[in-house]
Amino acid sequence: MKPVHPTIRLPVTLAAAALLVLALGPAQDAGAGGSAHGARAPIMKTRKIAPGLKYIRIVRRQIPLRAFVLKVDLSKAITLDTTIADDALPSRRQLSRIVRNHGALAGVNGDPGEGLGNTVHPFAQDGDLLHTAGPDAEMFAVSKDESSTFLGNPKLKVNVTDLSSGRVFTMDRWNRRAPEPGEIVGFSPLGGTLASPPSFSCSVRLLPQGAPQVAAPDGVDRDYAVDVATCSESPLDRNGGVVISTAPGTDEAEMLLALTPGTLMRLHWTLGWPGVFDAVGGDPILLLDGVPAPICVSCARQPRTAVGVTATGQILLVVIDGRRPGWSRGATLGELRAILRDLGAVDALNLDGGGSSEMVVDGEVVNRPSDGRERRITNAVLILPGADPGE
C-alpha cells in the first residue's frame, strides 16, 4: 500500500517500449519481457484522442497477439473516473453504454463482478463507498484532484461520529448484509435492492447535509442529520439518505435509539490513502515499486485487462484479446506483467478478464471481446473530458 507519484508528468518513449511489448514468443518464459531473436517488430498505431489521452493499438501477427492501450496523463484537462454500471446495485450494462451515458472519451472494464450484479472487491465512485468486502483487497485508486494515484492493499475503515457527543460508531460492514448481534452495519442509496436495510432491526436514518469532502489526513467525510431512530419488523427506507442498523435488544441498539432527530453525524470512510474519491479492485497485483509480485505461474493465457502506473505517474489501461485463434491468443499473468513493464509500468494490477475484457474509444468497441459480443459488466474505469461532474 503506497502513494504512487504526483501527476506532473514526463513523456514516456512509448514507441521504443512497444518494440518489446509483444515480442513474447511461444517458447519464452511467462514472466519474461524483451524481444525474441529474429522476430519482426510489432505493428503499432497511435491516435491522440484528447490532450493527455492517447490510444495505442499493437499487433503481433506471428504469435498472434493484439493489445490495446490507453495512455493517460492526468495533469491535462481529463479525469479518471470509476463507476458502477447503473445508479445502484444490482448493476449490469455493456461498456459501450456506460461510456455513452457518462459522456466519456474512453473506458475499460473494471473489477470482476459477482453474479448478482455487484463488484467482488470494495469500490468507490465520486466519494461514495459502494461496499466493504474482505480484508485482503487489492485496489487502484485516484485522488479527487487527480494529482495522485495509489495501488496496493488498502486499510478500509468506515465509521459514523455523533458530532455533539463525539461518540464513534464503527461500521462492521457497508452495503453487504444484515447485522449479527453486536454489529452495526450501514446501507446507502448505492446499495439499491441488492443491499437494502434489514427487517427486524433497530435502525437510524441519516439525511445528507452536504456533498462528500476530502478528509484529513485521509479518507472522505460527509455530514448527515438524524431523521428517525426506531426498531421495526419492516426495513427502514433510506429516502435518499443512509440507514445504520443493528440487532434489537443489544447495547448497540440502545446507543442508536438514543440519537435524537436533528443530531449532526459525520460519515467517514477511508482506504488509508489521502484524498481518494475513486477506487477499483482487482487481483492480483502484478508490480509494486517495480518489483514483480507473486502471481499464478500456471494460469493459462486469457483475455486480460489491467491498470498500470509508470515511474513518471502516467496511467496505462491495457486490454489484451484472447481465446481467438488467428487473431489473439491472450496472455498469461506473467506475459501481462511483462507487457506492462515494457510499457513503462512500475505498479500494475490485473482487473477483470475473460469475456469481460473490453475497451471503448470514441464510442467504438476497439477490441474483439472473446464472447463475440459485449458482455454486461458491473463497473468500469472511464476517462472523462474535463472535470468529473459527479464530484
State the predicted function of each range.
Residues 2-14:
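Bacterial N-terminal signal peptides that target proteins for export
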Residues 9, 22, 28-391:
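Gly/Ser/Thr/Pro-rich low-complexity, intrinsically disordered segments
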